[in-house]
């Protein structure tokens, strides 16, 4: 089966203490007015990793020097002809967020991320956060060990 041509990404951003996760409130469909991870499209000729850092910078003001992103997983939606690549990382410092388009907010880890009225992704967000929490996700200046 052929892989989809359209590739999107989403980025799970934890604060430096790894007790909060960053969300944006979507202003357009799909999932208008629901909370989701930041992310966007991988442009032609761009690597997936570069696209993740670019989208993070554009949507939040968070730069490569403030976070190390790790590839977490990908989901392929064959019937919708796109692949979603999921990255996760933990900030190495407190940051001042810069909203590009969608409002941004930090949420505690004990939120009900399965609430379909509040969160995008048909309950995928809860699963993604649980997977991300299984890994140490050391900040930029720490080594994996």
PLM regions: where:
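Active-site-adjacent beta-strand/loop module that shapes the phosphate/pyrophosphate-binding cleft
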Residues: 73-112, 121-136
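Short connector loops at helix/strand junctions that flank enzyme active sites
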Residues: 6, 32, 37, 64, ...
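A short beta-turn/loop motif at secondary-structure boundaries
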Residues: 3, 29, 75-79
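A short coil-to-beta-strand element that immediately follows conserved catalytic motifs
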Residues: 63-72
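C-terminal regulatory/oligomerization modules of transcriptional regulators
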Residues: 134-145
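Conserved N-terminal beta-strand and adjoining loop/helix that marks the start
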Residues: 1-21, 41
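Conserved Nudix-box catalytic region and its N-terminal flanking loop in Nudix hydrolases
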Residues: 20-58, 145
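Residue-level signal for short segments within beta-strands and strand-turn junctions
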Residues: 13-15, 25, 90-91
